[in-house]
């Protein structure tokens, strides 16, 4: 067995390619930063803060810019004796209701040992406890709710919190809410009253294009990678792959980081395009497998139905076209099939996980409908399914059909 030894031939500071790294300067977001600073200006002026809503795909800089500007804001308010600023940040990814968010905020504000139970209180009682904690802090309070779309349509807190002072629930505390969402449709699903308050100032973060991603990578490489350790075309390839997929800086950085790790493990002297291609395949496989862990049996069967249609070159296709395929797979797995509406819900979940893409068709005589297809490589999807479903015969048949049609 070999010994653990340091590998330092490629990376100078690999952490600079990680999600937690905060660069000294945010690249390619000058317009968004300027607009964001204008929205935060009332804090410095001593007025009640704006409620701000940010939306855009994962990895386009929403959270990074927020952290960057709020750090700067806290530094700058130190020059003013009449401003007392507190910032509370909460990631809502695992929280699916206003009640859960309110409990987490209360417990974030209370000292260790003083937390409240996550169940057992009426919702308004929890809200009241939250107002008491906010009033105890006083001054200006910015509450950042990242991935706020996780709470779905149970959005009462998003209505109550921005209006707390106007409704007499707060006296001295001036609260502003910053909501960050990866879901473009979340805003439209909010109660109109919530839209009026939470979306006082809206900032959209568009996907990065390949040129912007290459510039971001170049700035990080200066910190993260040793001189001469990236072959010509590597950064351009990372940028092009990420731009073609989602426009995510996180994806581009992950490709470079993993490509560097693959190069080091193979004792290469520099990162080459082949390492990036291998990194892409590995990340795509991990993405599908991660999504699989969140799926129920019916979610997996719904996905296998789409994979089967893809093997036959029959995608994109509608829910009703997938339903017979799904029912057949349920029969093979001795599982009771759900109704067509429930299948539609599982397909929507797969879309949210980034495993499927959906194209809206507005020409239907009975209203709009979606056509679904894989948003991950066919090979990655079928391999992941073979690990989680005991349908060897059916999956082998799908593979054979795909091979006949040169799919994957």
Curated annotation (Swiss-Prot):
Binding site for ATP: 60-64, 208, 220
Signal sequence residues: none
GO annotation (BP), single: DNA replication
Assigned keywords, A-Z: ATP-binding, DNA replication, Nucleotide-binding, Plasmid
Presence of the UniProt keyword ATP-binding in the record: yes
MF annotations from Gene Ontology: ATP binding; ATP hydrolysis activity
Pfam families, sorted: AAA_22, Cdc6_C, Cdc6_lid
InterPro entries the UniProt entry points to: AAA+_ATPase (IPR003593), AAA_22 (IPR049945), Cdc6_C (IPR015163), Cdc6_lid (IPR055237), ORC1/CDC6 (IPR050311), Orc1/Cdc6_arc (IPR014277), P-loop_NTPase (IPR027417), WH-like_DNA-bd_sf (IPR036388)
Function, in words: Involved in regulation of DNA replication.
Protein family membership: Belongs to the CDC6/cdc18 family.
This protein's name: ORC1-type DNA replication protein 15
Organism, scientific name: Haloarcula marismortui (strain ATCC 43049 / DSM 3752 / JCM 8966 / VKM B-1809)
Record gene name: cdc6o
